[in-house]
Amino acid sequence: MSNNYAIILAAGKGTRMKSDLPKVLHKVAGITMLEHVKRAVDAMEPAKTVTIVGHKAELVQAVLEGQSEFALQSEQLGTGHAVMMAEPALAGLEGQTLVIAGDTPLITGESLKNLINFHVSHKNVATILTAQADNPFGYGRIIRNADGEVQKIVEQKDANDFEKQVKEINTGTYLFDNKRLFEALKDINTDNAQGEYYLTDVISIFRQAGEKVGAYVLRDFDESLGVNDRVALATAEAVMRKRINEKHMVNGVTFINPDATYIDIDVEIGAEAVIEANVVLKGQTVIGERTVLTNGTRVRDAKIAADAVISNSDIEESVIEEGVTVGPYAHIRPGSLLKKDVHVGNFVEIKASTLGQGTKSGHLTYLGNATIGNNVNVGAGTITVNYDGKNKFKTTVGDNAFVGSNSTIIAPVTIGDNALLAAGSVITKDIPEDAIGIGRGRQENKEGYATRFPFHPSQK
């Protein structure tokens, strides 16, 4: 087990978000900002992680339940005060402790590991994670001496003209010698404009004691982004989306327009897949090799196998096997299974149903709570009537059956293998194997009756 520890600051309300949801629970690329930070922290293999909770603590704890210890900051009295809340869990332990805000979703595990290596190799008591900003306005500046040693952190409002020209900024992430951190926290106070305990004050305490403080500069400024409002949230989303899409492209996926493609962080895509513009892939979706998703397709928590073609359709919580074609304008709802080489065409809705291998439903159909066998033809306009206002009922269709167009199947009904359901029928009873089911009125022609209606030329 390592002697690395982590404190994630997640107690704040995030007033500028203008939301009832705690700030760290807003999502970027499908998971909360807090989860992004926790994943980065996990890369350093901490022996303990303590998450500081406060505003709506129960919601925050639910996200990391079983993954972190928690400490409650009942009053938000500053970053230093927040870290103090972790003392019962961490005080006295040998090693180094990361302190990181839960609203920094772009930080990477690689950067945190580099921070630890830098800290240990330089034998620092504290190391600040910094970044070079083209426009440092609003950030605390890192002030170094002529030898490049960190002297202090100066906030924007306190900086003189020279200090304001410094482009190295404090990201708000730190690595400390664990014992010295909690010793120094006992010496900070609220003698400042905000009346709060500032974590940055421990840096001054270390310097005054002649202890070594360093700074590790991030390679990518984007990683330093702290999200305080919806504008920054959108910025984080855009940066993360670019990272995700580029990762898939490097792995052999073709994107027609990556700037207009939205893929959550946990989505998996096989090589040689083609993703057209305005495709949205969410949750735990898996896309197989060589599968094509055309413009406008949306998939959530579904598994789509290799060599499928999904055209401008919605698929949710379902499984699509190899060689299936769906759409355009189809809706595959939760709990559905489309087996190998199934075809589901335009304006077809499938809900909690299984379609067997080679089955085709080409147009204007609703199949709900149905099990359809192999090589079945489902004609245009077929409707399974599966709901009586309270209960759902099942339709079963055997292999090689033929369901004629404009058929209504009032469940529960079983249609046998090789059966034929006559077009235009309303089916209320089972149809045996090899039988024809007909449920419609017999046609009757009345000669000359059309002349009585206003449309007829004789009436004009």
From Swiss-Prot:
Query: Pfam families from the entry?
Result: Hexapep_2, NTP_transferase
E.C. number, please?
Answer: 2.7.7.23, 2.3.1.157
Q: What is its main location?
A: cytoplasm
Q: Which GO terms describe its molecular function?
A: glucosamine-1-phosphate N-acetyltransferase activity; magnesium ion binding; UDP-N-acetylglucosamine diphosphorylase activity
Cofactor, free-text remark: Binds 1 Mg(2+) ion per subunit.
Record region (Pyrophosphorylase): 1-230
- Which cofactor(s) are needed, names only? Mg(2+)
Q: What is this protein called?
A: Bifunctional protein GlmU
Provide the species name: Streptococcus suis (strain 05ZYH33)
Upper lineage ranks? Bacteria, Bacillati, Bacillota, Bacilli, Lactobacillales
